[in-house]
Amino acid sequence: MTCKIIGSGGYLPPKIISNDELTKFVDTNDKWIRTRTGILQRHIAGDAEYTSHLAFKSAQKAIEDAMISVDDIDLIIICTTTPDNSFPSVATKLHGYLGLTNIPSFDLQAVCAGFIYGLQLAHSLIVSGKYKTILLIGAEKMTSLLDWNDRSTCVLFGDGAGSVILQRSNDDSGLIDSNIFSSGTDYEILYTSGGTSMNGTSGKIVMQGQKLFRHAIEKMLQSIEDLLYANQFSVSDIDYFIPHQANIRIINKLAELLNIEEHKVVKTVEKHANCSAASIPLALSALKESGKIKKGDILLFSAIGAGLTWGGALIRW
């Protein structure tokens, strides 16, 4: 028994900042950004547009795509690093926006690996029989954590949200397997300079880029190889590889090491930048909207985030 995605939806704020526009207030240039990251632009939420608003708009699309009633949802999980408030959770605010009553809702924080963590948790809860229809969302306003004077980080991130509706599968489609990991000894590679119990502020993103690149390749590769081996899959069985959209160099290097054909690799980092927990569901939504994906296709997800946290998932569409 497993669970499957019956609907998906993505939302990106309408405001776009190109690399050229960044050069007006950051010491950088388009070539430098493109060469190192593959990013051409990023979507930026407005001052009065919060993570809960992004989540709501993507949730509406996923509910419509799944062709269900909002009242069919019996659990909400939002994966986010950028909540509107320290409390209550973004999920409970969304609960109110959707007009729901009494069903549980909570946030999950595993940074860029959040969607993989959330997917494994949602799967377990559905398979247990406790819940039938789960709304799982990755939603981030990453620009709220940026130091716009730090060109090594401010060029990398964008805002957005991606949602999926999960239900029990009655056939061979759905989540085949997933794995998640963490390594707390590596937290100083990527973190924020603040927190509510530390100094009462959210802080700004601090990153050791070269170390993170090495860890990303090593850990994502091992996670993927473990998944394939455990489920007797080969790389040639994969129809679409949807990695976390952090950096084009990481994506390309993984594809090279795994020997995955170029047309199978889903890349949205060019236009979305790094949307943290939202990046995989946003990329999935874009792939689905393209009309390329078909029933029976095998999808491979892979992500790594601060913590460090990482993991992967195999899905039969």
From Swiss-Prot:
Q: What class of enzyme is it?
A: transferase
Q: Name one GO biological process term.
A: secondary metabolite biosynthetic process
Any S-S bridges, and between which cysteines?
none
Give the location in the cell. Cytoplasm
Keyword Lipid metabolism among record annotations: yes
Instruction: List UniProt keywords, sorted A-Z.
Output: Acyltransferase, Cytoplasm, Fatty acid biosynthesis, Fatty acid metabolism, Lipid biosynthesis, Lipid metabolism, Multifunctional enzyme, Transferase
The EC number(s) attached to this protein equal 2.3.1.180
- List the InterPro entries hit by this protein, alphabetically: ACP_syn_III_C, ACP_syn_III_N, FabH, Thiolase-like
GO CC terms for this protein? cytoplasm
Q: Under which pathway is this protein filed? A: Lipid metabolism; fatty acid biosynthesis
- Cross-referenced HAMAP family, in alphabetical order? FabH
Similarity comment: family membership: Belongs to the thiolase-like superfamily. FabH family.
Q: What is its biological role? A: Catalyzes the condensation reaction of fatty acid synthesis by the addition to an acyl acceptor of two carbons from malonyl-ACP. Catalyzes the first condensation reaction which initiates fatty acid synthesis and may therefore play a role in governing the total rate of fatty acid production. Possesses both acetoacetyl-ACP synthase and acetyl transacylase activities. Its substrate specificity determines the biosynthesis of branched-chain and/or straight-chain of fatty acids.
UniProt-recorded name of the protein: Beta-ketoacyl-[acyl-carrier-protein] synthase III
Q: Which gene encodes it?
A: fabH
